[in-house]
């Protein structure tokens, strides 16, 4: 499979390509790279995976060689090559140059280059080193305008009063990514039919209410057209937060009169109200409707900024106060953004912005899916996942209230909040290994330093990243690889039977030895070592010393993770967590995920300045999310 982020890697390679011919680059830089890092496993004496690289030519006209080059490109991009067993590893700059050279040469040969960096789940393919490089902070933002559906809550608010059995804009579960992302959801014919039915039901009720106002205006001397226009203006403000243009008003009045003539009053007003709801502007979020500057960039209008900020922090369209604030020409858009963000975060009566922060952590740590992981009830322990999720929600909110070193606290805290009533009813204190005589308390419960540490050892997270009947170190390691280390793992090939042997007398570590086969371990080497330390807990999230009457092995060795301070031998989950919590790289990766959640897209190199400023603000404010 040939893939690459054309905008990032090719932009790095093209300036060099203007100075050196492809053959010279191949001879001077690509061949030495292959010889140093690849030929020992893919040369004349050994061909792992039946791949040989020492006899490749710079030309990509041969189809078989082009396929090998594309596989090499993928392996370097996902840091599969060289393997973790290698003695030498290339620098990031060396790897980027070879990636750029392969991508450019493939394209010159007329081969398609699939762009993945803009797709959901592939944001880590954009170079982390470049995103946080001072040189890249001067690059202009180079992203396409976003277009995506409004949130389910926004649709429900728009058609309030209509009975919604199933919201057609319902979001998928995160599955490791974020639920709402630009371009993630299509708008199909079934969805259009459902939205139309909701719009008609809502408009029928609203039109009847509007008739009362129209009758009142008529009694005060208004002409029928004036009264109808006033009703349309009010509904426009309620739904779209603006007044209709002259052309829009003329079209809607024509529709009203036509339907009234054919079906009678107030069917015309009902049709107009439904038409307002069914406008693309009501159902989708648009950007970039203004004029481009001399460099081709389009700045968001003040109204677009208001809509973007409101959806980012509340998942709803902007309220009247926000729209009025952005109409203030005496303030710059940046100052208004800061002021309105502060207003929403400080709003105690409607703490929607704080709930939105909770939603980010729910999707980032992906622990709500614990409720979807079926577990057998076993003697002496009654599993109740919703209460565990509630506990972790409470811990996140408790941390956000303090708003100091938020990520580090969530990764390393020894204090958990245990929801008393539900756990007393369902027996969940046992999952925390609390003693039988434990006295419930609304205060945080402090655990011994050798038993629990932060979210990654919380029962809710452990259950969410487990199977129905066993632990899943692969899934846990994959989460760490993506969400904290900021790297990637290739998609599972369609011909792979991802299944462990069913041997009830073997420990999970022993059963996982099948993943050490050469064709498997190039990917599993990036997940298994990160997930194995969490074998300290069973798949219910209970702390343990033994597995199948054998001492549980929680040691691991991390090699070439991309984060040097994380590499090395680890003796358990706490040592691994502390290394990641103290890593600047992991903190920067966290900032990248915050960016993706609130902007609804992956970052590009043009966002380097924004990300660097966001990370600096986080540091300067002592790890504050509000900063």
For each feature predicted by the language model, list its residue ranges.
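Hydrophobic h-region of N-terminal signal peptides that target proteins for export
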Residues: 11-21
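Aromatic- and Gly/Pro-enriched helix-to-coil junctions and flexible linker segments
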Residues: 20-216, 237-238, 242-254, 258-262, ...
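Extended surface/linker regions that mediate inter-domain or inter-protein docking
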Residues: 97-101, 111-114, 121, 125-227, ...
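Extended, well-ordered alpha-helical scaffold/bundle regions in very large, multi-domain proteins
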Residues: 247, 285, 297-306, 310-359, ...
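Amphipathic alpha-helical segments that form the core helices of the histone-fold
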Residues: 250-263, 325-333, 338-348, 381-383, ...
